[in-house]
């Protein structure tokens, strides 16, 4: 097992592509590309709208990317994208930034013994290069890296709650698994739509061949329309920075920069031609999952519970038109996520020494 080092995401792009087969988060790959390609476009909005992230953004630029790649004769086994720290003794796994809910190494689909060997080789190389400690933000507690770290000197600083919805084939099985109260709320929303004579439509677009494509001027215009719903929901949090907040969420955030793009999707619920709810994010084909860092509802249609209907419509559509069987709603354990059949899981803020234990 050999370990190579690259000083940019672009330089390691081939290896990064090779190591997405074992369920590694699609967010990591897609957003890293957006960060490196469009950093200066992001910075003004990020620094002004999210002051607590400004230092992270600036340091991201000042600490260039470094990517370690473990490979054997069959190809890349593991990729470790880092932000190289200026003091040389501390690095964070790249992706610790606004709206990214998973941060981890990228693993190829290989036997566990090969992944273990690659992990130890990469950590040893980091230690040789003077990186004494490494940090993960939002590391999945039941993931591959977390299982390796159980035998490694490490500390968990904070735990975050996340929710994913796993559904069977067909909408009927999903609905039967919901609580009586959840089914009643969905039924009430549908009845209100019928009584009020509302026309409801659902659409799904992706760049991975599921649903309609995401290219073209029409799609870009549609994205501006549905993102305005998200902006309106966020503006109340940033009243003193209204224009900057709008520019950031429409154009400068990492989700905005990486969707549309490789591995991206958008699902939208419309009522009488207006956006009632939408979600956007990434398709993780290895996990057969949607990763959803951004979901928003239009308050104008609040009486119809558009967010709940969006999830139900998405489950029905995905069951019939794809092999996706998980909608990962990521960080946050809001009640509506659990009512819709969500399952709690944890991500952690972790620090570890790079020195390989005996």
Model-derived regions: residue spans:
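A conserved beta-strand-loop-helix scaffold within acyl/acetyltransferase catalytic domains
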Residues: 3-92, 139-144, 148-157, 162, ...
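Active-site donor-binding loop signature of nucleotide-sugar glycosyltransferases
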Residues: 8, 107, 165, 283, ...
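Secondary-structure boundary/capping residues
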Residues: 48, 198, 327, 345-346
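Acyl-donor binding region in acyl/amide transferases
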Residues: 85-158, 287-344
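Flexible, glycine/proline-enriched loop segments at strand-loop-helix junctions
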Residues: 106-110, 173-178
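Short beta-strand-to-loop capping motifs
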Residues: 107-110, 165-168, 206
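Short capping/connector residues at structural and topological boundaries
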Residues: 110, 180-183, 341, 349
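Conserved catalytic-core motifs of GNAT/GCN5-like acyltransferases
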Residues: 157-165, 344-356
């Amino acid at each position: 097992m050999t370990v190579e080092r690259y000083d940019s995401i672009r330089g390691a792009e081939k290896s990064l592509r090779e190591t997405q087969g074992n369920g590694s988060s699609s967010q990591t790959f897609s957003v890293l590309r957006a960060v490196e390609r469009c950093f200066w476009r992001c910075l003004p909005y990020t620094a002004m709208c999210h002051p607590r992230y400004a230092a992270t953004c600036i340091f991201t630029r000042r600490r260039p990317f470094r990517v370690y790649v473990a490979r054997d004769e069959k190809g890349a086994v593991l990729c470790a994208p880092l932000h190289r720290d200026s003091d040389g003794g501390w690095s964070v796994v790249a992706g610790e930034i606004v709206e990214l809910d998973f941060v981890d190494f990228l693993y190829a689909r290989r036997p566990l013994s090969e992944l273990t060997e690659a992990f130890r080789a990469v950590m040893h190389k980091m230690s040789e290069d003077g990186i004494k400690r490494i940090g993960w933000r939002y590391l999945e507690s039941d993931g591959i890296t977390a299982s390796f770290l159980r035998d490694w000197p490490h500390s968990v600083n904070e735990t975050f709650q996340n929710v994913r919805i796993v559904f069977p084939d067909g909408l009927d099985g999903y609905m039967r698994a919901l609580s009586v109260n959840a089914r009643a709320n969905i039924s009430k929303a549908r009845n209100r739509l019928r009584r009020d004579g509302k026309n409801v439509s659902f659409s799904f677009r992706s760049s991975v061949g599921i649903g309609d494509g995401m290219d073209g001027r029409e799609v870009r215009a549609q994205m501006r329309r549905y993102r305005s719903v998200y902006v309106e929901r966020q503006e109340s949090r940033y009243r003193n920075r209204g224009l900057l907040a709008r520019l950031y969420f429409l154009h400068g955030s990492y989700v905005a920069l990486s969707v549309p793009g490789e591995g991206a999707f958008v699902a939208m619920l419309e009522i009488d031609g207006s956006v009632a709810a939408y979600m956007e994010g990434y398709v993780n084909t290895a996990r057969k999952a949607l990763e959803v860092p951004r979901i928003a509802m239009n308050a104008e249609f609040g009486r119809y519970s558009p967010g709940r209907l969006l999830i139900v419509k998405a489950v029905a559509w995905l069951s019939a038109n794809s092999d996706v069987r998980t909608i990962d709603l990521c960080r946050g354990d809001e009640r509506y996520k659990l009512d819709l059949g969500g399952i709690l899981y944890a991500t952690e803020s972790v620090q570890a020494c790079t020195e390989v234990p005996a």
